[in-house]
Regions:
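Glycine-rich phosphate/pyrophosphate-binding loop at beta-loop-alpha junctions
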Residues: 28-31, 36-125, 200-206
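Catalytic phosphate/nucleotide-handling subdomain of diverse soluble enzymes
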Residues: 61, 68, 179-206, 210
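Active-site-adjacent helical/loop segments in soluble small-molecule enzymes
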Residues: 11-26, 31-34, 110-188
């Protein structure tokens, strides 16, 4: 699902409820124990669904936003400025090759205090100037998010390492998430919280960058 329709975002909350219930059923977590969620994303739909699920009461600690080299979301969480004025990079995780993250608007609306006028102004700035900046007050509401990205080289190394360690081949999008999770652990020291890494793309369904150039 790559739609920006609100109904699709709402449906995706079930992924995280199911994952939490599965962990609890298998005895991996205790009742009400918080987990982290790592989501590889460009359009912000799946991680927004996790955010909604958290706000509805699902025990989620950190929402870890994983980007590829089109790291507009990482830069947003790092600086508070969303800026699409940059080169577009074709990567091996093409479903994340996005510079205008359409579902982020819904998060902006929430942290703007459900202020439609303020939200509209920022989206108009994005349309005309290619960027907008949120206020410090709005940034403070993003404390539950962590953002980072992986390069193409790092993504390939993650796939290789996981295959050598487990015999399991992950797709490039999931590898981005796994690589970012490693960075999260190093940056925060949080190695104890149980963590779900969302796999949002099938291994054999996405075209390579070369395929995209030829299409």
């Amino acid at each position: 699902l790559y739609s920006s329709a609100a109904s699709d975002v709402y449906k995706r909350q079930a992924y995280y409820v199911y994952a939490y219930a599965k962990l609890y059923k298998n005895g991996a977590i205790a009742k009400d124990e918080k987990i982290n969620v790592v989501v590889p994303t460009g359009n912000f739909g799946n991680i927004l669904a996790a955010f909604y699920a958290k706000n509805m009461g699902l025990p989620i600690a950190k929402l870890i936003c994983a980007s590829n080299e089109n790291k507009v979301l990482y830069d947003f969480f790092s600086t508070g400025t969303y800026d699409r004025n940059r080169d577009f990079i074709l990567t091996s995780s093409p479903s994340m090759d996005i510079l205008i993250s359409s579902n982020l608007e819904r998060l902006i609306y929430r942290i703007a205090g459900n202020d439609a006028e303020k939200n509209t102004k920022m989206m108009e700035e994005l349309s005309t100037d290619g960027k907008y900046a949120i206020t410090d007050e709005m940034r403070a509401q993003l404390a539950d998010f962590y953002g980072n990205y992986t390069s193409e080289e790092e993504t390939a190394k993650t796939i290789k390492k996981l295959y050598e360690d487990t015999g399991y081949i992950i797709d490039t999008h999931t590898a981005v998430a796994a690589g970012v999770y490693d960075k999260y652990k190093k940056d925060t020291g949080d190695t104890e919280t149980k963590t779900v890494i969302a796999s949002t793309c099938l291994l054999y369904t996405s075209p390579s960058p070369r395929d995209k150039r030829q299409s």
